Amino acid sequence: MTSATPNAPRLLVVRNDKLGDFMLAWPALATLKAASPQPHVSVLVPGYTAAMANACPWIDEVIIDPGDSASRKAQCQLLGMIRERHFDALLTLFSTRRIGWLGWRAGIRLRLAPATKWAQVFYNQRITQRRSHSAKPEYRYNQELAEAMIGRLGLKPATVAPPYWPEAAAGRPEQRQRLAAQLPLSTDRLWCFLHPGSGGSAVNLSLDAYAHLVEGVDRHMLEIGQPSPHWIITAGPGEEQHADSLVDTLVNQGSSAFRQPPQPGLEGFARSLAAADAFIAGSTGPLHVAGCLNLLTIGFYPARRSATPLRWQTCNSEDRRLAFHPPQGAGETDMTTIDLETAAASIAERLSMVETSSQSDCSGEAS
């Protein structure tokens, strides 16, 4: 968290859904904090993402949203908290009726949101985006709303760039040292983190498909004269058994695979990802954490318009992204139609451009 300029505008930003959605709001939050005079930025988030909000360098205050199903008493307490802070503006990155009604009742003078659905009636500044067309990345839609807010407040904008979690990205050497003390990893080989879980919402490859992919990457790396990577398998809550099963399969097929050691909570897990040379997953929250760390991300996406690789693109640098999805004409969510052999070859080619820690300086920065 950070501190704002005295007498600066007080903003309330709302993105109160899943981890991945919240991580894709960090570029917008960075855009707001880069403006001058620098505003005070509070966020309204669910308890699940509060730890990450507290770790975000672009946030001054975190307010917990009790959610749609909370009691009337809890909703009234939230309204009181919002009122007593005397916010100058409300920026809702994803508009809902409850949040629009909350901002209106709290008496926030400037209320800005996407012009979508009937919840927009509670906002006096509406930005037409047509997100359902998925013509841009989600994080760019969020940044456009932040840029509009900066303009409405008469602030001076500034350019921002990855990494959007610079402090955690700078902790890469420490995270690598910690992991090397826990697992028998060589710095002569790349450390590829693989997250096979779905978080309950994202479409992802099956465990068998990931095993096939890893075998292909290992084989292609050896064919081009590079050592195969170490594979560190991560897991979210309730996904541990699947992760263990994948590790067993990979070890049995001859890959160098390990389960990531337990981490202290969501923030600890998120920070630990900085140790990776590459992060592979479906379009899940951890993939977007890796994007904020400006890691090399390798994502597997469905082909439906609301969930394309473009729409849910990670917010790292353009040259640090690879994405795969079902071919045209296949089922939108049929991940079995992705050509894993072609994907493995592309991944191996990109990994061959990354320097191992033993080849680079002590920062371990991936190329």
Residue ranges and their predicted role:
Residues 1-367:
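Catalytic machinery of carbohydrate-active enzymes
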